[in-house]
UniProtKB/Swiss-Prot annotation:
Lineage top rank: taxon: Bacteria
EC number: 2.1.3.15
Major place of residence: cytoplasm
GO MF annotation list: acetyl-CoA carboxylase activity; ATP binding; carboxyl- or carbamoyltransferase activity; zinc ion binding
Subcellular locations according to the entry: Cytoplasm
Catalyzed reactions: N(6)-carboxybiotinyl-L-lysyl-[protein] + acetyl-CoA = N(6)-biotinyl-L-lysyl-[protein] + malonyl-CoA
Subunit structure: Acetyl-CoA carboxylase is a heterohexamer composed of biotin carboxyl carrier protein (AccB), biotin carboxylase (AccC) and two subunits each of ACCase subunit alpha (AccA) and ACCase subunit beta (AccD).
Pfam family, one: Zn_ribbon_ACC
Entry function: Component of the acetyl coenzyme A carboxylase (ACC) complex. Biotin carboxylase (BC) catalyzes the carboxylation of biotin on its carrier protein (BCCP) and then the CO(2) group is transferred by the transcarboxylase to acetyl-CoA to form malonyl-CoA.
Protein name: Acetyl-coenzyme A carboxylase carboxyl transferase subunit beta
Annotated family: Belongs to the AccD/PCCB family.
Length: 319
């Protein structure tokens, strides 16, 4: 027997021995490998922990509907503007027609676009909620995303509801050109009208939150929350380094870096997010049951409360 025949025979024996193992039925996706620490986790346990690795705390991405299930009390979610769907006004084509790309993502995600909006209860407290989905064209903000968020904010303003937006986006959608960019000002205007009614707005920045979303409604909150180690910024890291010709810090454009420099108010792990949001919304209620001492006495006029602040701009303050 030649050396070649010997190797061929042994290869056939090896394949025969491995065949029963290959035929063994193993549930697809039974285990999940952490992208950060490489730990293997039973997928069911990972989902029960809201897709957060128990070994290192790495936050895996979650879809918009899963995020709603994590935050909203069961049976209280009412989706709004679900029938608003994108079109292709510019007849845009890159490697594929924009209209075809939209159909592919709609079939893949079972979403009409990169955000879902609605109302519900969070620990019994009503709110208006928008959740962006990075799985739909990178969570890019097109005209429909802008319209749905704008409608949600306007609904919250009319109904006196706090608004929470969970951001996950690569920025404005290039396939819609200026129609995409104008959503930045459109949503910002709606949020300003919401603010004048003294209503609460909280954006939650997840990985990633970049581009035009960061440059508009993601940074306009009364309180700005972020998930741990989320990438948050406007331009990409390499673009900034090449423009400035400087090496950026390793933690640049992370939620921890932004917290250190005052751009976000708190970093909240996903497993604590629902409780934290409920506490913030509860404390903002005009009549909070556990803080009666903070309510104004009946004889105190609300306008009088601000007089000492106004007086600081007069010369009498310095006499």
């Amino acid at each position: 027997m030649s050396l070649f025949d010997w190797f061929a025979a042994n290869r056939q024996n090896s394949e025969t021995q491995l065949q029963p193992q290959q035929e063994r039925e193993i549930a697809d996706g039974l285990w999940t490998k952490c992208k950060s620490c490489d730990a293997l986790t039973y997928t069911k346990d990972l989902r029960n922990n809201q897709m957060v690795c128990k070994e290192c705390g790495f936050h895996n991405r979650v879809g918009s509907r899963e995020r709603v299930r994590q935050l909203i009390d069961e049976g209280t979610w009412t989706e709004i503007s679900q029938n608003v769907a994108p079109t292709d006004p510019l007849k845009f084509r890159d490697k594929k027609a924009y209209s075809d790309r939209l159909k592919d993502y709609q079939e893949k995600t079972n979403l009409t676009d990169a955000v879902i909006t609605g109302t519900g209860l969070i620990d019994g407290l009503p709110l208006a909620l928008a959740v962006m989905d990075f799985g739909f064209m990178g969570g890019s903000m097109g005209s429909v995303v802008g319209e749905k968020i704008c409608r949600l904010v306007e609904h919250g303003t009319a109904e006196g509801l706090p608004v929470v937006v969970v951001c996950a986006s690569g920025g404005a959608r290039m396939q819609e050109g200026m129609l995409s960019l104008m959503q930045m000002a459109k949503i910002s205007g709606a949020l300003e009208r919401h603010r004048t009614k003294k209503l609460l707005y909280i954006p939650v920045l997840t990985n990633p939150t970049t581009g035009g979303v960061t440059a508009s409604f993601a940074m306009l909150g009364d309180l700005i929350l972020a998930e741990p180690k989320a990438t948050i910024g406007f331009a990409g890291r390499r673009v900034i380094e090449q423009t400035l010709r400087e090496k950026l810090p390793d933690d640049f454009q992370t939620s921890e870096y932004l917290l250190q420099h005052g751009f976000v108010d708190a970093i909240v792990p996903r497993t604590e997010l629902k409780k934290t949001l409920a506490q913030m919304i509860s404390l903002h209620q005009p009549f909070h049951p556990i803080l009666p001492e903070l309510q104004l006495a009946p004889h105190v006029e609300k306008e009088k409360v601000y007089e000492p602040i106004a007086s600081t701009s007069t010369n009498d303050f310095y006499k």
